[in-house]
Amino acid sequence: MKVHRIVFLTVLTFFLTACDVDLYRSLPEDEANQMLALLMQHHIDAEKKQEEDGVTLRVEQSQFINAVELLRLNGYPHRQFTTADKMFPANQLVVSPQEEQQKINFLKEQRIEGMLSQMEGVINAKVTIALPTYDEGSNASPSSVAVFIKYSPQVNMEAFRVKIKDLIEMSIPGLQYSKISILMQPAEFRMVADVPARQTFWIMDVINANKGKVVKWLMKYPYPLMLSLTGLLLGVGILIGYFCLRRRF
């Protein structure tokens, strides 16, 4: 009797959770809460689960595409930027001046990318700093900066172009304003309408909408369910065996 009950509860759990899929894993607690709140605000059913390596966000499979797109358009999950402690660890061996300069330059790029990513509407930001080059006559070409910003079409990012250039100019000493190049590109909406997706009748939608009634019914009639599942598994096994024999002969 105990074995039957364990099998029944396992099957029941599978039916009630089979339509949920992982959205993101290993998230920090605060970021997971922000993402969950954003999804709930847009009526996307989601839940979080604490794991050993962080928080896992789960959503219904039918809402997976819209959940990913909604978070993407709002810059989630956030990029992890390199810090000076990681670039210059205390136990690091002595590096060449050229390598040290490259690391410092990379940290500057990361710092500017981090500031731009904090702006409302910025999905992704990339910054490249070209260091001065010297010719044979010791004449140095000035530094230049190239910036690429992918932003949400819900925000008029072009209105901030001048302020972004001012921010970059002040972040790099000696940089000429005319040597700053910025390319902005709006992201495309790839969200799907929720209504057409619901026109198809799925038994899992019914189960989710009536979990309490389903649980009571299954607890009252566990054996018919077990017999049905056994027949289903047997039928699947027969089909697999049939196709394997056809491929062999």
UniProtKB/Swiss-Prot annotation:
**Lipid positions (N-palmitoyl cysteine):** 19
Using the chain's own numbering, where are the disulfide bonds? Answer: none
Listed A to Z, the keywords are: Cell outer membrane, Lipoprotein, Membrane, Palmitate, Protein transport, Signal, Transmembrane, Transmembrane helix, Transport
**Localization in the cell:** Cell outer membrane
Which topology term describes how it sits in the membrane? Lipid-anchor
Lipid-modified sites (S-diacylglycerol cysteine): 19
Query: Signal peptide: which range, if any?
Result: 1-18
- Please summarize what the entry says happens upon disruption of the gene: Disruption prevents SpvB-induced F-actin depolymerization in human macrophages without affecting intra-bacterial SpvB protein levels.
List the record's Gene Ontology CC terms alphabetically.
cell outer membrane
Principal localisation:
membrane
For this protein, the record's Gene3D superfamilies field holds: 3.30.300.30, Hypothetical protein rpa1041
Entry annotated with the keyword Iron: no
Annotated TM spans: 225-245
Q: What is the purpose of this protein?
A: Component of Salmonella pathogenicity island 2 (SPI-2) type III secretion system, required for secretion of some type III-secreted effectors including the SpvB toxin.
Instruction: Write down what this protein is called.
Output: Secretion system apparatus lipoprotein SsaJ
- Species this protein is from: Salmonella typhimurium (strain LT2 / SGSC1412 / ATCC 700720)
